[in-house]
Regions:
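Solvent-exposed alpha-helices and their adjacent loops that cap or buttress functional pockets
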Residues: 17-19, 42-43, 91-94, 115, ...
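ATP/NTP phosphate-donor binding region
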Residues: 1-98
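A short, small-residue-rich loop immediately preceding and capping a beta-strand
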Residues: 94-114, 118-128
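Short beta-strand/turn micro-motifs composed of small residues
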Residues: 51-54, 103, 160
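A glycine/threonine-rich phosphate-anchoring loop and its flanking beta-alpha core
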Residues: 117-215
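C-terminal charged capping/lid subdomain of soluble metabolic enzymes
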Residues: 1-16, 300-420
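Short glycine-/acidic-enriched loop or helix-start segments at secondary-structure transitions
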Residues: 59-62, 110-112, 134-135, 169-170
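Active-site segments that bind and position negatively charged phosphate/pyrophosphate groups
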Residues: 208-360, 364-367
Length: 420
């Protein structure tokens, strides 16, 4: 499968001109053996450094891309953060002109960030269908404990070898399925924000993301049977998600309330115990179930007007008490110009019928749960290290990790505990 990314660039009916940094993506068995052909075809020249984790280095042993320098990172406790990026930047030879990421999500975020810091080119070789960030223009980092996106470089070319991807640990593709499942609530949140505040909504990008999500959900039985074509479908959807984000210029089409749930768990607030880590996509998959359940509950209300309250900012004291001093200052700054302040009582009341229709179009929690169950994937809070008793705390505080309008954030303007 060859994706010509240039066709997604240019003027659009939404009024914007979309730009694309990624030129092409190849999703084929054995395509890493043809690495040199694609580098020549797209004119990617200069000294290379290939960045691996120990696991991806072993998995691709018979097809390592040619590179003058190789950096292999210890996967123990490896995260895309200030520590790993400092290590790579210190090791990266000064005359390297191209970074080649050979690995899954963490390796890619480290590589794309370092490419941006050095002002050099970036090529992506995913070894697991685990996250939708392969084509991203930003790096998803945990920076001094705070989950944030930092400027980075999108890959010029993506070479996804499905022979490698299919033989990767099952938890990687389960994470990828969870990350794509998350697009349903992310898209609903985007559309609801458009209704409430006239936030820009591009129908072309929306359609790309919707199709990607539907493709993966239909491929779940094939994944369960170990079919390589199903793994290719997941990889395709993850890459298209990244292309959609490039077109938009941010992660809005791919990230909503379910991602904020995942991010809050990853940040480990002081007053929120997390027993053990889980992969990003595993958390967004569970986050999707939680968000769909809550949104469907709210949609049962025919008239929200009696439950609407005035907007009120979150007191600084709450950030310090719940998130702790390690995270408080960053989150206070993140929420300074609260997007929820743009939503009036009148607009929320008048738009409620339209919001209910958007929620009605979401897949049911039962349908999404059955798909995760078919793969024996994680599908409740306990499986991702969080007590079920913490659910209400999670729903209340997770929107605060990102200043982005979602229905979950809008709950602050509802007398939520009076709604049965």
């Amino acid at each position: 499968m060859f994706i010509d990314c240039s066709k997604y660039a240019g003027k659009c009916a939404c009024g914007r001109e979309h730009t694309m940094e990624t030129r092409a993506a190849v999703i084929e068995p054995g395509c890493l053996f043809e690495f040199e052909k694609y580098m020549a075809q797209f004119g990617v020249t200069g000294k290379r450094c290939a960045l691996y984790g120990e696991n991806s280095y072993a998995a691709t042993a018979d097809r390592h891309p040619r590179a003058e320098q190789k950096i292999v990172l210890d996967p123990t406790g490896l995260h895309a953060n200030e520590i790993s990026t400092a290590e790579v930047l210190a090791k990266l030879e000064g005359d390297v002109e191209v970074i080649v990421a050979v690995g899954s999500g963490t390796i890619h975020d480290i590589a794309r960030f370092c490419a941006h810091e050095r002002g050099i080119r970036f090529v992506s070789c995913p070894t697991g269908a685990s996250v939708d960030g392969f084509c991203s223009t930003v790096a998803a980092m945990t920076w001094y404990g705070f989950k944030k996106t930092l400027p980075a470089v999108a890959p010029e070319i993506v070479l996804a070898d499905t022979e490698i991807i299919k033989n990767a640990p099952m938890e990687l593709v389960l994470s990828g399925v969870g990350d794509i499942m998350a697009k349903y609530t992310a898209l609903a949140d985007w559309k609801m924000a458009h209704v409430l505040t006239n936030e820009l909504l591009c129908e072309k990008i929306y359609s790309i993301m919707q199709d990607a999500a539907d493709t993966v959900m239909q491929s779940v039985p094939g994944i369960a049977r170990g079919e390589e074509s199903a793994y290719a479908d997941v990889t395709y959807a993850l890459i298209m998600s990244g292309i959609a984000m490039q077109m938009m210029g941010n992660s809005r089409p791919a990230s909503g309330a379910e991602h904020h749930i995942s991010h809050m768990i990853e940040m480990e607030p002081e007053a929120f115990p997390v027993k053990f880590p889980a992969m990003h996509g595993e958390k967004t998959g569970v986050g999707s179930l939680i968000a769909v359940r809550e949104y469907k509950r709210l949609a049962k209300i025919e008239d929200i007007t009696p439950y609407i309250t005035d907007y009120a900012p979150i007191p600084e004291e709450h950030f310090r008490k719940f998130f702790g001093e390690r995270l408080a200052d960053s989150l206070i700054k993140e929420n300074e110009n609260d997007c929820l302040a743009k939503v009036s009582r009148e607009k929320l009341s008048a738009s409620w019928g339209e919001l209910r229709h958007i929620i009605d179009d979401l897949p049911t929690e039962e349908y999404l749960y059955r798909l995760l169950e078919m793969l024996d994937a994680k599908r409740d809070l306990a499986s991702i290290g969080v007590e079920e008793s913490e659910l209400s705390v999670l729903l209340k505080n997770s929107p605060l990790v990102r200043n982005r309008l979602t229905l979950m954030r809008t709950r602050r303007m509802m007398k939520i505990y009076e709604i049965e």
